[in-house]
From Swiss-Prot:
Belongs to the centrin family. CDD domains: EFh. Ca(2+) 3 binds at residues 111, 113, 115, 117, 122. SMART domains: EFh. Residues 1-24 are annotated as: Disordered. Keywords: Calcium, Cell cycle, Cell division, Metal-binding, Mitosis, Repeat. Gene3D superfamilies: EF-hand. PROSITE patterns: EF_HAND_1 (PS00018), EF_HAND_2 (PS50222). GO terms for molecular function: calcium ion binding; dynein heavy chain binding. Binds four moles of calcium per mole of protein. This is Caltractin. Ca(2+) 2 binds at residues 74, 76, 78, 80, 85. Ca(2+) 1 binds at residues 38, 40, 42, 44, 49.
Amino acid sequence: MSYKAKTVVSARRDQKKGRVGLTEEQKQEIREAFDLFDTDGSGTIDAKELKVAMRALGFEPKKEEIKKMISEIDKDGSGTIDFEEFLTMMTAKMGERDSREEILKAFRLFDDDNSGTITIKDLRRVAKELGENLTEEELQEMIAEADRNDDNEIDEDEFIRIMKKTSLF
């Protein structure tokens, strides 16, 4: 367990921030989704087509999210997105999804009883396995820092929030 925990954390530290690299297979999937929804062959897709294309790639974007994405990506103000813009956007989205999955892997290393929360007992065990000699007060402070709903435990959302806040992921 301690080896796995160290591996997950060090792998994330070593990974470059920002744009993640996509495999050729992922790029091909993105190209196929784009082409499928570029029904008129214009080389661009509009907001409605974007939503359908993203769903085909496994995302569930909300209307506001689509509008925001288009305004950030559509630099020429045409209201449409070309393939390069779509690829840039989907690369970022896939990076966010990968980051979340990595954080949840780390969460599961702490939550070895699969309760869905990290307790002070879980934190104490991991600290000991990693050779960290933390006091009860320090452990409690760590829980308190992440705990948003005052239940003295850290759930998945709280863990994701604190990991992103501390830039460990």
